[in-house]
Amino acid sequence: MNRVNPKALLISLAVMLALDTLGGMILTIFFASQSVRENTTPEQTRAAVEALNQSSGFLLSALAYGTFTTILGGYLAARLAKRLPYFNAGALGLAGVAIGIFLSGSSPLWFDIVGFFVTLPAALYGGHLSKRDVPPNA
């Protein structure tokens, strides 16, 4: 018996990654706009964006937003699966950690560690929230 609903996992993972990408772009534009001006060279722009990866404000904002999208992804995985909400939300969290390990790179170590330790609990919390929204006789 398969406990993880693959369709629910893939859809919720795609939504979570799309929201993460969009949010990352918005955060980058917001934070970079403070240091990049109209007549900035491409090298200066690249340096400003690389400096963002070391900026505490940017990184904390990215962690908060990523945690929100992970909660949303866990909620969505659990709702779409229609059964075993914690198991399906947890599978999403583990997939998120695996992707995070694969994509980690230029950010500080503390950022990666906090992100990895927050991902699974955030996804499980999303699964918990989905349980609250389902009537007991469903």
Give the predicted meaning of each segment.
Residues 1-138:
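Juxtamembrane/disordered regions of integral membrane proteins
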